[in-house]
Amino acid sequence: MVTKRTLLAACLLTVLIVLGAGVVLLGGCARKETVAVPVAVEEKKEDPGLHQAAEEKIAGYTRPEALISVYELNRRLEDSGTFIIDTRGRSFKVLQASYPFGHIPGAVPVLHSNYCHPAYPGRIAAPLQLQDFLGKCGAGAESNIVLYGNDGLQARLYWALKMYGFDNVKILDGGLDKWKEAGYDVATASSRRPPDTFEFDLADSKAEQTMAVFNDVAAAVGDSGCVIVDARRNDEYLYKHMPGSVNLSSEELFNQDKTFKTAPELKVLAEAKKITPDKKVIVYSNAGVRSSLVWFALSELLGYPEVKNYDGSLQEWIKLERETEKSLQTKPVTLQ
């Protein structure tokens, strides 16, 4: 009897070891990351009606290729060309508090500083620096890049890529929150890709059409053919803003679920602020981040022909001792 028990225990131990090894091997095959899969959680079935409604909304924008719904991304998740970037890393501390606690499977995390100019803190990186960084992250010339975030950095990186001539890029409508709401899995382990070759075709650079510099803004002040848009919160605008600017806060662009409002809703919102497509538009914030969201809405979603994002934004304007206007005495908490 003792011998039989001993043999039975040995067999059970062998089975457990084999199963454990199998789990480890399987975990190492999924996009080079180990994903924590919830146990005994019922899979949420996709609602075809929600998917269709999301696609119809996106189709209503001037450039529908600029956005992707969570439903469509889920279908493309295993495509080898899909390259997802998590832009929530405003700082290393923020990245540590967000990415390891849940991200879209396969998403590569980036820090804001990774695509900032080393000599001009907060300014966008030069094209050679940015392409080298993206290549090291694993993005290639044929990658289908999808960006998601929650504070405007997704739009800033989108703006930079488009400015330097790379068009195969989209923003995830609703970001990670919408992804979770749809019931899709999230990963917790870091995702890495082998380095690739990523190069901008600078012959297609749109820098002159998409980025405003100080002289552009100075010339626009007082010009009836131009409108300067402040993308910050209203309390920030009231405390201090560029002369003659109008306030269209980036927060006004979104629904409660953090998806963009429809094209007709955005159009009404912009025109109520006297922001019309017949004018040259320059958008600013504190450091060119939130202004990227308003640039994206006006340029990509509504198709305004002349919209520029002021990279230096209010930080540069004040540093150069240019005039500002104010009507609120209490200084608010400011963002980028």
What is each model feature region?
Residues 1-4:
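N-terminal secretory signal peptides that target proteins for export/translocation
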Residues 55-142, 216-278:
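Positively charged, proline/Ser/Thr-rich regional signature most characteristic
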Residues 89-92, 113-117, 150-154, 176-178, ...:
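Solvent-exposed loop/turn segments at secondary-structure junctions
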